[in-house]
């Protein structure tokens, strides 16, 4: 199970699939093929030219739809970003769910986003540490992300072994962009309120040159949620030269963005504020609104692609990618003072009076009721009382500074920067009219830089790099309270690093191949891959809780993984097709889950091993001139998965680093899509899924508190707990009209079975109560409200003497249903005090939630010329 980059591995693949492959082997010494193989081996990856299969009308219609999807992805650091995007030209269901169900953050089959691979020009763009692709990286690049090739879990493609959650390959070559100029202006009441776009593509001229450029600006002084703002500039620039059978393209793009976040809160606080979109992250400073959670995100990327058409049956594509991403997220914190957050549990009415238990004699008294009313009256009397009081924080810090004390309140910034370089190559060979062989390689090296800085001292004059959380256990003069023993008691100013500073280093090599063939009425493919990964931590501070195991490089974890897939489709005639697929693979644990407490020490998670993933699928599709239909049933099971999380454990005034190992999960369900024409202008479409996604066992858990540095082990009772923040049941019915340049859609959506992220703490065996037989009594998982949502869009395409103008209006949640819960999490704090007494406030009854936006829309004007 080890892989070393210091050794060279040769992989010999003997293939007896068909006589044509033997002929290719015999031709190996011929010049062109020899050059192709040498270039393939030396470059290392694969990709394929792709086509934009959307028609002009569909492009006009999708403009607002795509923008809506984009606005829902990764727009809040505290909401789940596990959003998967799938598409398919052959599957009605997969073709629609990407944007249609984005208001509730739908994830394809409830999979984690790391199972959804995204490529650009054949180069893998998923983050090497988390395994996920962040769609904000291509935010605003609407034209560029239109052109692409998509494959479902058991559909062969030209750029990779298909992933369990679908695989996308966007074509960013300038010659693939729609020729001409395009200008667009949009107004909305979503995360941003104004958007301007301009794009240009020359197409290939007589000398073989193509140039493409795009610029997008998105802005909101206030987004849909109060206290948020949005400021983003997207750019794209590409040039391509084709000469003979060769094409070289260079493109660069980026999306520098600054945006303010929305925080989850409890239903009690939403009720007091009379607002489902109450946001605890902002407050007033000198009478002006200020958000404490501001995200700055910029990932400039450059991509060099060489395409070589060796002959009519063979093509080589090679890409070199470089990306430097800069991600900063701020947060209000406090030191030796009261919690400044406006929805802190101690200021809520239910902390004084137990609203859940009528038999509670301690917290159901007359004085407790008076305290409840006083708290309610205070919070409900003024909006300012429900928000952060920055003026008070400044005053407290000024007073502390006058006494020579450290800042009591401050804004810290967490940085997650990354340098990523990838080299990839693909060789696409048509063996004959019925057989095809594609093979590819990917090499990548990543340096993730993780550290914390002082963003704003809020009027204070000093702060020290000391672990104030540990002061309750250790003396101020002890080594354990030092974040960096190499620089003890270091003074921290604005912009200085403190708390933690470390790098994560990841190297990966991947080899894959896909063979596909058509035999009479059967089409089949076989795909396989083998990969090697190594990872390590490089600490830049010597933490007092792990003075001999935090500074410098850790050991190196090495993994060898791989797997295979097979897919079959049978054409039964008259438009009837049956599909079958099965796959098994080993997957290396991601670097983001591999380290037990990366902010403190170099330790890897105990018992770290490859995931084992099995998946299977059965599908049926029917295609007629007036109707298309498909239904798919699937089953997937994951074993030996590793999960990691970090949360603030209020009971111990400490951060808790939690690793779950030996995790098993299973996913199964049925998906369907149906679309048929009523007349030439009217059509009806129905799509839906009924699914299950849950833990299949109780996991091993190891945890550490940031105040002690000691590990604890337990069993976490997760069996039966569902995947969170996505509907496991969703249905849609759409009535469409498309005639003489007009298009109108009316869609009814129903969502249900949306669960909140579980608290692992409340499911530790030592925390759970037990019955007389010793079995743990595990709390039920919180489920959010589902509901019905009505959407509509109307548009008109107007052809002008010079170009064409399209106008479209998209409306979401027309009936203003604000009760649909899109996600949230259970709080990880006990209902008992440290001494074992009951609290009036029950954390187990007060999860924090997000709700779907009420009525919102976008009006879009697009001019092409």
PLM feature spans:
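C-terminal beta-signal and adjacent terminal beta-strands/loops
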Residues: 49, 639-640, 684, 750-769, ...
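A beta-strand signature from Gram-negative outer-membrane beta-barrel systems
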Residues: 127-128, 139-184, 195
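Transmembrane beta-barrel wall of Gram-negative outer-membrane proteins
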Residues: 187-220, 224-262, 294-311, 567
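Acidic/polar loop-and-plug regions of large Gram-negative outer-membrane beta-barrel proteins
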Residues: 240-242, 247-305, 328-413, 476-493, ...
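Surface-exposed extracellular loop regions of Gram-negative outer-membrane beta-barrel proteins
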Residues: 258-260, 264-265, 269, 480-491, ...
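Outer-membrane beta-barrel signature, preferentially recognizing the C-terminal barrel domain
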Residues: 279-301, 305, 504, 554-563, ...
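Signature of Gram-negative outer-membrane beta-barrel scaffolds
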Residues: 410, 437-573, 700
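Gram-negative outer-membrane beta-barrel transporters
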Residues: 521, 635-637, 656-762, 860-864
